[in-house]
Amino acid sequence: LVDRVRLSAHLAVPHGRDVLYIVEERAPGAPALVTGVDVRLPMHLTASGRAILAALPRPQVRALFPDRDAFVHRIEADSEIDRYSKLRAELDATLTRGYALERGSITPGFSSVAVPVLDHRQWPVAAIAVTFRDAEVPVDRLAGLALEVREACTRLSTRIHGRSR
């Protein structure tokens, strides 16, 4: 994936309300990212986490985020997800788009696109994401980039006896 898109990529798994990054491959010349191996970040703020959450049944998402205290705040922004209604709107947009998108919620000036990896029950067991400087990837390239990520997820899902969404 990194060789094809020439952007850094990572694999994250759900860990409570967080995602845990278990693999990171940095593109040549790309800057170090906060998403290194063994780093945990709030699921609702990351593209990887949003991809996983969007693939979960609504009651499961609600169980993870029962009230405003469940939402961690990282960067003050107008678009900050700080309540369930905002999270639900973002997850619905993710489902409509076909991929999760995070723009500056983790690191200002950087964005990520992610797709879930599903098991044989269609349950999200992980997500693959690519992260890039906003200036490197024009908005009209995001859908194509998401297709590349989806292909990687499909291959991984197949290897663990799942299928892609």
Predicted regions and their residues:
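Intrinsically disordered, low-complexity terminal regulatory regions
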Residues: 1-26, 59, 144-165
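Residues embedded in well-ordered beta-strands
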Residues: 10, 20, 51-53, 111, ...
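Structural detector of well-ordered beta-strand residues that form the stable sheet scaffold
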Residues: 10-12, 42, 102, 127
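Residue-level recognition of conserved beta-strand positions in structured domain cores
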Residues: 13, 23-24, 35, 45, ...
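Generic beta-structure capping elements
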Residues: 22-25, 55, 67, 127-133
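Residue-level signature for short turns and capping positions that connect secondary-structure elements
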Residues: 26-27, 48, 135
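Short, solvent-exposed recognition segments
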Residues: 30-106
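Extended hydrophobic
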Residues: 77-153
